[in-house]
């Protein structure tokens, strides 16, 4: 999709190289030697013609450095060995090793339509099609709707923050990289491991649901068998090149989008009287009511409030993955163009897919429907399917349940993809074993895939009589880890904006400027922090060790890793503004000329508008 533009093209550089090559450096006066070296030393970052070693290796690999310039630089370096002139690296073996390591990158093979559709529907899965049953039964249609709207505002600002940073510095697993650069190494490493833990656990959740969705049709095959089969299939899928992942997610996400849009039209018809039930309208908001029974407390108002608070946790789990575009930025072609487009569609995704879907579900399914709170299994079927069954539309429930199955498989596939890229990023920055930075010829971090998939085997926990309890444990652990990532995104963006101001850089000059900032970042950081600490309130009513452990285990692990990093790195709690790095990786992207990928026909224009 692009090519490296020639960084060293100045005639002044070539002329200086040739002059020095013609004259022996020993014959030059000492002051002239110092002057010449200051002008041409590649390690001197103050000269406009200098390049760092990473760029040099890249240029050397692509053959875009002029042969004479390379020879002259080597000649000068060798002739001045006695003067002990030190560059970034002078050891030939280390240079060759670095050049070899530079080849081991993930590939920028995701196009605009891939990024857009992944951001639009890539991680829509269990949280939406299955997980909304719990908040609906606890908080009722109105309570759950308010919870999802409130959480949606937080997610919007989080993605805006991430979009501004990821467009300016598009790197793989930018969520963890930004925490390390703009906050401190301890924040970055702890956030990285927790974010990986989040997606690995979410993979277990998704795989555990697949078999139970299939049980809608038959229960003759053991649940454990379905879990094993799809665990193997999804894990193997992640060994294909990222382009295959992009194509798969593009078409599956397209099915999700079309299915949800079709459901919304269908639901509107049923609400208006298009079934044997007659016009439904707000019938179920009047009886059994707009607010659910609540939880824990016998006091109606208090119980409903607690039910609403618990719905926030389910909403957070449902929205997880909206920030996925920040992970794909490092594998996106022309990220300065593709990432902003995807970010700007987040609000459309929140309103259409989540808010509108929950609104119609609340109209068509009463909160006291027994199928919403089945205790023998996590789900008997999706609330979407229940609403279709209530309308008496034959065959359509089976079709939509098949859509749910495809959706959950897609979401599970994205879980492994994200987790493997997080481990890859940690390895590339020296914060994980270097083996996790190894990739196949197609750019797949295979050890990251294996490690992430291994934790997905926790899905077998649901194969017992306490399946519902195990399922909720996995959701709580995953959700809290995801909330911590959102918090770090907001905090990193706050420091990023402060660093820009410190350098005198206007945000108006950025490739993408987040809306309503910095207020949106402070808003998201504050409420995410509150939710992190109150989300486990049920463990205290009364106090239960097992529930406390599952509610706060992610927070405990985060604290342990953070403190360990502080001790190991002996770093400041947070970087000084003048020490914040906003240049690394950015210059490399700016040196690339991307091909124009504008839509050329009606079909491409349609997908550009949708994705």
Swiss-Prot record:
<feature type="transmembrane region" description="Helical">
    <location>
        <begin position="142"/>
        <end position="162"/>
    </location>
</feature>
<feature type="topological domain" description="Cytoplasmic">
    <location>
        <begin position="244"/>
        <end position="256"/>
    </location>
</feature>
<feature type="topological domain" description="Extracellular">
    <location>
        <begin position="275"/>
        <end position="303"/>
    </location>
</feature>
<keyword id="KW-0597">Phosphoprotein</keyword>
<dbReference type="GO" id="GO:0032126">
    <property type="term" value="C:eisosome"/>
</dbReference>
<feature type="modified residue" description="Phosphoserine">
    <location>
        <position position="75"/>
    </location>
</feature>
<feature type="modified residue" description="Phosphothreonine">
    <location>
        <position position="77"/>
    </location>
</feature>
<feature type="transmembrane region" description="Helical">
    <location>
        <begin position="257"/>
        <end position="274"/>
    </location>
</feature>
<keyword id="KW-0813">Transport</keyword>
<feature type="transmembrane region" description="Helical">
    <location>
        <begin position="514"/>
        <end position="532"/>
    </location>
</feature>
<dbReference type="GO" id="GO:0016020">
    <property type="term" value="C:membrane"/>
</dbReference>
<keyword id="KW-1017">Isopeptide bond</keyword>
<feature type="modified residue" description="Phosphothreonine">
    <location>
        <position position="90"/>
    </location>
</feature>
<feature type="modified residue" description="Phosphoserine">
    <location>
        <position position="87"/>
    </location>
</feature>
<feature type="topological domain" description="Extracellular">
    <location>
        <begin position="465"/>
        <end position="473"/>
    </location>
</feature>
<feature type="topological domain" description="Cytoplasmic">
    <location>
        <begin position="419"/>
        <end position="445"/>
    </location>
</feature>
<feature type="modified residue" description="Phosphoserine">
    <location>
        <position position="64"/>
    </location>
</feature>
<feature type="transmembrane region" description="Helical">
    <location>
        <begin position="224"/>
        <end position="243"/>
    </location>
</feature>
<dbReference type="InterPro" id="IPR004762">
    <property type="entry name" value="Amino_acid_permease_fungi"/>
</dbReference>
<feature type="transmembrane region" description="Helical">
    <location>
        <begin position="399"/>
        <end position="418"/>
    </location>
</feature>
<comment type="function">
    <text>High-affinity permease for lysine.</text>
</comment>
<feature type="topological domain" description="Cytoplasmic">
    <location>
        <begin position="322"/>
        <end position="344"/>
    </location>
</feature>
<feature type="topological domain" description="Extracellular">
    <location>
        <begin position="137"/>
        <end position="141"/>
    </location>
</feature>
<dbReference type="GO" id="GO:0003333">
    <property type="term" value="P:amino acid transmembrane transport"/>
</dbReference>
<feature type="transmembrane region" description="Helical">
    <location>
        <begin position="186"/>
        <end position="205"/>
    </location>
</feature>
<dbReference type="Pfam" id="PF00324">
    <property type="entry name" value="AA_permease"/>
</dbReference>
<feature type="transmembrane region" description="Helical">
    <location>
        <begin position="474"/>
        <end position="494"/>
    </location>
</feature>
<feature type="topological domain" description="Extracellular">
    <location>
        <begin position="533"/>
        <end position="547"/>
    </location>
</feature>
<feature type="transmembrane region" description="Helical">
    <location>
        <begin position="304"/>
        <end position="321"/>
    </location>
</feature>
<feature type="topological domain" description="Cytoplasmic">
    <location>
        <begin position="163"/>
        <end position="185"/>
    </location>
</feature>
<feature type="topological domain" description="Cytoplasmic">
    <location>
        <begin position="1"/>
        <end position="115"/>
    </location>
</feature>
<keyword id="KW-0029">Amino-acid transport</keyword>
<dbReference type="GO" id="GO:0015174">
    <property type="term" value="F:basic amino acid transmembrane transporter activity"/>
</dbReference>
<feature type="transmembrane region" description="Helical">
    <location>
        <begin position="548"/>
        <end position="566"/>
    </location>
</feature>
<keyword id="KW-0472">Membrane</keyword>
<dbReference type="InterPro" id="IPR050524">
    <property type="entry name" value="APC_YAT"/>
</dbReference>
<feature type="topological domain" description="Cytoplasmic">
    <location>
        <begin position="567"/>
        <end position="611"/>
    </location>
</feature>
<feature type="topological domain" description="Extracellular">
    <location>
        <begin position="206"/>
        <end position="223"/>
    </location>
</feature>
<feature type="modified residue" description="Phosphoserine">
    <location>
        <position position="79"/>
    </location>
</feature>
<feature type="transmembrane region" description="Helical">
    <location>
        <begin position="116"/>
        <end position="136"/>
    </location>
</feature>
<keyword id="KW-0812">Transmembrane</keyword>
<feature type="topological domain" description="Extracellular">
    <location>
        <begin position="366"/>
        <end position="398"/>
    </location>
</feature>
């Amino acid at each position: 999709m692009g090519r490296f533009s020639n960084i060293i093209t100045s005639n002044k550089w070539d002329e200086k190289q040739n002059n020095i090559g013609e004259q022996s450096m020993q014959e030059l006066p000492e002051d002239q030697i110092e002057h010449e070296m200051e002008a041409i030393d590649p390690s001197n970052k103050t000269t406009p013609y200098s390049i760092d070693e990473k760029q040099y290796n890249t240029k050397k690999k692509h053959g875009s450095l002029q042969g004479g310039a390379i020879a002259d630089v080597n000649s000068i370096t060798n002739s001045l060995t006695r003067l002990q002139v030190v560059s970034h690296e002078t050891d030939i073996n280390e240079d060759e090793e670095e050049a070899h390591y530079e080849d081991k990158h993930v590939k920028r093979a995701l196009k605009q339509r891939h990024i857009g559709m992944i951001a639009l529907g890539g991680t829509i899965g269990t949280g939406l099609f299955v997980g909304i049953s719990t908040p609906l039964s606890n908080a009722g249609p109105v309570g759950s709707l308010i919870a999802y709207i409130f959480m949606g505002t937080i997610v919007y600002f989080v993605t805006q923050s991430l979009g501004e940073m990821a467009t300016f510095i598009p790197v793989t697993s930018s969520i963890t990289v930004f925490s390390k650069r703009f906050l401190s190494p301890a924040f970055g490493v702890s956030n990285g491991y927790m974010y990986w833990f989040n997606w690995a656990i979410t993979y277990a959740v998704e795989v555990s649901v697949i078999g139970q969705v299939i049980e809608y049709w038959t229960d003759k095959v053991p649940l454990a068998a379905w879990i094993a089969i799809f665990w193997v299939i999804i894990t193997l899928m992640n060994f294909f090149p990222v382009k295959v992942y992009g194509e798969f997610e593009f078409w599956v996400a397209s099915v999700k989008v079309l299915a949800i849009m079709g459901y919304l039209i269908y639901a509107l018809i049923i609400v208006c009287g298009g079934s044997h039930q007659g016009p439904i309208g707000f019938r179920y908001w009047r009886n059994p009511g707009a607010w659910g029974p609540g939880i824990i407390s016998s006091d109606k108002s208090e119980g409903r409030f607690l039910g609403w608070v618990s719905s926030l946790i389910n909403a957070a789990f449902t929205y997880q993955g909206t920030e996925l575009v920040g992970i794909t930025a490092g594998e996106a072609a022309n990220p300065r163009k593709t990432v902003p487009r995807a970010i700007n569609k987040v609000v459309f995704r929140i309103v259409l897919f989540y808010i509108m879907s929950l609104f119609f579900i609340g109209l068509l399914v009463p909160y006291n429907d027994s199928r919403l709170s089945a205790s023998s299994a996590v789900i008997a079927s999706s609330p979407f399917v229940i609403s279709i069954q209530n309308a008496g539309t034959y065959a359509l429930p089976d079709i939509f349940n098949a859509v749910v199955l495809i959706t959950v498989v897609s979401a599970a596939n994205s879980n492994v993809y994200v987790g493997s890229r997080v481990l890859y990023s940690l390895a590339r920055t020296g914060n994980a074993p270097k083996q996790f930075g190894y990739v196949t010829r197609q750019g797949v971090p295979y050890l990251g895939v294996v490690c992430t998939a291994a934790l997905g085997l926790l899905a077998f926990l649901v194969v017992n009589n306490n399946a519902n309890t195990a399922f909720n444990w996995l959701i709580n652990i995953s959700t809290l880890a995801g909330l911590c990532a959102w918090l770090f995104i907001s905090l990193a963006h706050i420091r990023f904006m402060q660093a820009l101001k410190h350098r005198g850089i206007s945000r108006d000059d950025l490739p993408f400027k987040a809306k309503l900032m910095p207020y949106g970042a402070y808003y998201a950081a504050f409420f995410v922090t509150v939710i992190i600490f109150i989300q486990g309130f049920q463990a205290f009513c009364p106090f239960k060790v097992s529930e406390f452990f599952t509610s706060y285990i992610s927070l405990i692990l985060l604290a342990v890793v953070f403190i360990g990093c502080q001790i190991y790195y002996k770093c400041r709690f947070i970087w000084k503004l003048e020490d914040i790095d906003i240049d690394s990786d950015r210059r490399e992207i700016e040196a690339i000329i991307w091909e124009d990928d504008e839509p050329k026909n009606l079909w491409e224009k349609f997908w550009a508008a949708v994705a």
